[in-house]
Design a protein with these regions (language model features):
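Amphipathic, hydrophobic secondary-structure cores in small proteins
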Residues: 13-64
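C-terminal edge-of-domain segments
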Residues: 61-81
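Detector for methionine-enriched segments
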Residues: 1-2, 50, 75
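Intrinsic-disorder/low-complexity, polar/charged segments enriched in Ser/Thr/Lys/Arg/Asp/Glu/Gln
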Residues: 8, 37-39, 71-73
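Right-handed parallel beta-helix/beta-solenoid
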Residues: 2-13
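Intrinsically disordered, low-complexity regions
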Residues: 5, 16, 46, 80-81
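Charged, low-complexity, helix/coiled-coil-prone segments
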Residues: 1, 33, 68-69
């Protein structure tokens, strides 16, 4: 992500279990155009592993923007997948 880039959409999925969090990410990305940014706040652990790998497999670029003790913030660049 370029410094200073603001996300086009933001979703907070902390406390949302798998696979609901992944499905919500996919739905949010479907509403975006290619190269738009989605900010995702997500719990660490299984949600992080499942969502990050699933979105990458679907053709989106996923970067960990910041990480706290129990959650992290992802910046997902829509790949149109």
């Amino acid at each position: 992500m370029m410094a200073g880039s603001l996300p086009d959409q933001q979703i907070d999925l902390r406390g949302i279990s798998c696979p609901k969090n992944f499905i919500r990410c996919r739905l949010a990305l479907e509403a975006l155009d290619v190269n738009q940014l989605l900010q995702v706040d997500l719990d660490c652990g299984e949600p992080e592993e499942m969502v990050v790998s699933g979105l990458r497999e679907a053709g989106h670029r996923v970067e960990i923007y910041s990480k706290e003790a129990t959650w992290l913030r992802l910046m997902v660049t829509c790949g149109g997948g």
